[in-house]
């Protein structure tokens, strides 16, 4: 049973990063995948999210599905398009009809995964960015800190916003003065980038993953209008598996100001993903 965090997230808070896996008889995994996740259904997600007060959600296409976005689109439909959006994986074989279909299905961005692979190819980044610009989408990047530092000049020139996963992959143990973190801050300073304050994958110490506090606070202070937060549920590949309520507790402790929390959990996601209201 999940214990709700204290204090709770504000109304209309958005979980901007999680995955759905299965059912595998309907949505089989890609043969080129690098791991085999256990099933994680829409019902499982809601059983986790509702007690935490997470009322909006962004389903991120996982690498194990390649460019077959059916499981992600199905999840958006089942959650309801009034409260759910998606980030898809595509390559240059996608045609304009398919892009419009994805947009109608709630997709608001595409993901480039340089860690788990099996996603949007890096060499197609520029061309795909130009194609999705007219849709108002963004590109989401999952990379380690070293690769992100190398890519930063290219990302800053793209014609679409760029969402950086998991604190930019910069290890918390490096400290906020490290060259990788400073490169991330410079990228945020361009006003073109967004950052997900999902912190445990950047931890250098492991459980309870609380060494990322300085990174989260620095980013929340540097780019308050371009920060969002996500659970990364069901935490694929993690051992031990984080308690999702504990992760939300951490975030609320690290960002104690109610106005800042509301901005990161409600206002910023509404602006980026196109939700229509920011208060109840």
Predicted regions and their residues:
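Hydrophobic faces of well-ordered beta-strands that scaffold small-molecule active sites
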Residues: 14-18, 57-60, 84-88, 110-112, ...
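Conserved, mostly hydrophobic/aromatic
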Residues: 17, 49, 72, 102, ...
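Catalytic pocket-lining loop regions of alpha/beta-barrel enzymes
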Residues: 122-229, 237
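Active-site gating/metal-coordination segments in enzymes
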Residues: 66-146, 153, 194-203
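Divalent metal-dependent hydrolysis catalytic cores, especially in the metallo-beta-lactamase
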Residues: 31-64, 83-89, 107-115, 137-139
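Short, electropositive alpha-helical surface patch
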Residues: 67-84, 215-223, 247-252
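Mid-to-C-terminal alpha-helical segments outside catalytic/metal-binding sites
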Residues: 1-12, 38-56, 224-226, 240-280
């Amino acid at each position: 049973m999940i214990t709700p965090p204290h204090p709770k997230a504000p109304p209309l808070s958005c979980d901007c990063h999680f995955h759905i896996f299965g059912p595998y008889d309907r949505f089989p995994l890609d043969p080129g995948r690098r791991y085999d996740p256990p099933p994680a259904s829409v019902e499982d997600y809601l059983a986790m999210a509702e007690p935490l007060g997470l009322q909006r959600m962004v389903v991120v296409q996982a690498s194990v599905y390649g460019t077959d976005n059916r499981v992600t689109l199905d999840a958006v439909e089942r959650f309801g398009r009034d409260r759910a959006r998606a980030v898809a994986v595509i390559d240059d074989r996608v045609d304009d009809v398919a892009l419009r279909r994805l947009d109608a299905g709630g997709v608001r961005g595409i993901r480039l995964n340089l860690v788990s692979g099996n996603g949007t190819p890096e060499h197609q980044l520029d061309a795909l960015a130009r194609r999705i610009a007219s849709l108002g989408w963004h590109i989401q990047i999952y990379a380690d800190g070293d690769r992100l530092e190398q890519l930063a000049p290219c990302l800053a020139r793209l014609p679409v916003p760029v969402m950086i996963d998991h604190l930019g992959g910069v290890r918390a143990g490096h400290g906020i003065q490290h060259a990788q973190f400073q490169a991330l801050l410079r990228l945020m300073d361009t006003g073109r980038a967004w950052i997900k304050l999902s912190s445990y994958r950047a931890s250098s110490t492991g459980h309870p993953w609380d060494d990322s506090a300085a990174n989260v606070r620095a980013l929340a202070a540097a780019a308050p209008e371009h920060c969002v937060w996500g659970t990364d549920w069901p935490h694929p590949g993690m051992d031990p598996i984080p308690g999702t309520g504990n992760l939300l507790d951490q975030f609320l402790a690290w960002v104690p100001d109610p106005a800042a929390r509301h901005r990161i959990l409600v206002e910023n996601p509404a602006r980026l993903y196109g939700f229509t209201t920011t208060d109840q």
